A protein has these predicted regions:
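N-terminal beta1-alpha1-beta2 module of alpha/beta enzyme domains
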Residues: 1-61, 168
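Short, acidic/polar
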Residues: 12-23, 77, 174-182, 309-318
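Alpha-helix-loop-beta-strand connector modules within alpha/beta enzyme cores
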Residues: 44-64, 68, 123, 345-357
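An alpha-helical appendage that flanks or caps ligand/catalytic pockets
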Residues: 106, 110-160, 201-321
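Hydrophobic faces of well-ordered beta-strands that scaffold small-molecule active sites
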Residues: 3-7, 31-33, 59-62, 89-93, ...
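Glycine-rich, proline-tolerant flexible connector loops at the mouths of alpha/beta enzymes
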Residues: 30-53, 65, 196-198, 331-345
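Active-site mouth loops of central-metabolism enzymes
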Residues: 2-14, 64-71, 164-175, 230-233, ...
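Conserved, mostly hydrophobic/aromatic
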Residues: 27, 50, 81, 120, ...
Length: 357
């Protein structure tokens, strides 16, 4: 099965659309926009605009969360992008990180996340959600019955959704076993955020398929992918310097609450724990940070893909051979040297991307 290669962008005004157009021109299969309201613009506005500026490329949130929008609102937003893009939308979602941190919140509990996924899928299918369940997502607001209306909705659903519109697939970003299992039960796809280490990726794949089997579902009837920090550069150390902000950010997902799920040797655990303790959310995804200083060359060599184009192609092919059909590439860090970052992106687009086809 062909492997989709995606890139990640931001929904900043004017910039998001330019990034989507450039990604399509470069040959990427998909373009995902971050959802972090205090750090970037609205992703659904950016995706809708990108839908009209592009023709082929798939468009996704990368990723949204279960707390800043009701599942009906999320479903309606991405279904609108689906209609505007003629069926190219994907709903990427995780438990939340920077979007919640800037509201003073931690990621959503796994049980709440799974309930959200269940409701979200119902809305996207055009199914009904019980009003009691829909209202529960909004906390202690007074119930509709207090208004004593002559007539009220009997359930909650997207009435405007056309039956002929193809359902938007849900793609869960997952790292730990509980979230992987929840995603395996409810999503069309799981994109793992466990790094590029083959041992950790195999563990994540096995966890997902085991959860599907335990739920009575076909273990092979779900798409699997991975988020990968990739910077192509003749000098691996220079590649790490360009990528370190993103590498530290994604490494933190593997130790979000201070414990490392899945396989990791002693040195890997030491680095991950160092990233966890040093992480400064005010400098999220940036180079030159305390969290980036925790990264060692050995750790970066296994967790990320950094170095000459040929080695990047080889590593990405090895990862795809595990049965993954979607790879989302995170390139140079947000504040990396603009000229060097642009050169690295061109190197990936001109050398690595064609080499993966």
């Amino acid at each position: 099965m062909p492997v989709e290669i995606w890139t990640l962008g931001v929904g900043l005004p004017k910039l998001g659309v330019r990034q989507a157009v450039a990604a399509e021109r470069a040959g990427f299969d998909g373009f995902a926009v971050v959802d972090s309201q205090n750090l970037s613009g609205d992703p659904y506005v950016a995706l809708a605009l990108a839908a009209h500026a592009t023709e082929r490329i798939k468009l996704a949130t990368g990723v949204t969360n279960p707390l800043t929008r009701h599942p009906a609102v999320t479903a309606s937003a991405i279904a609108t992008v689906q209609a505007e893009s003629n069926g190219r939308a994907v709903l990427g979602i995780g438990r939340g990180d920077s979007a919640l941190a800037h509201l003073g919140l931690a990621p959503a509990p796994v049980a709440a996340f799974e309930r959200y996924l269940s409701q979200l899928q119902a809305y996207l299918r055009g199914d009904a959600v019980a009003l009691s369940d829909a209202g529960a997502c909004l906390g202690s607001n007074p119930a509709l019955e207090t208004l004593r209306l002559a007539g009220t909705p009997q359930d909650s659903r997207l009435h405007w959704l056309r039956a002929t519109q193809e359902k938007v697939p849900v793609d869960v970003a997952a790292t730990g076993p509980k979230v992987i299992a929840a995603a395996a039960r409810h999503a069309e796809r799981i994109t793992f955020a466990v790094g590029a280490d083959l041992t950790r990726l195999r563990w994540a794949i096995d966890t997902a398929r085991s959860a599907r089997t335990a739920a009575g579902l076909d273990p092979n009837a779900i798409g699997l992918g991975a988020y990968l920090n990739v910077v192509a550069h003749p000098d691996p150390l220079e590649a790490l310097r360009l990528a370190e902000g993103g590498v530290a950010s994604f490494a933190r997902f593997s130790v979000m609450h201070g414990k490392v799920p899945g396989p990791a040797d002693e040195s890997q655990r030491a680095v991950l724990e160092g990233v966890h303790h040093a992480y400064d959310m005010r400098r999220h995804t940036m180079t030159g940070t305390p969290q980036a200083a925790m990264l060692t060359e050995d750790f970066a060599r296994s967790f990320a893909i950094l170095g000459p184009s040929d080695s990047c192609i080889e590593r990405m092919r090895e990862i795809a051979a595990l049965g993954l059909t979607k790879l989302i590439v995170i390139g140079p860090s947000a504040n990396a040297d603009p000229g060097e970052a642009a050169a690295a992106r061109l190197r990936f687009e001109n050398d690595v991307l064609p080499g993966l086809r």
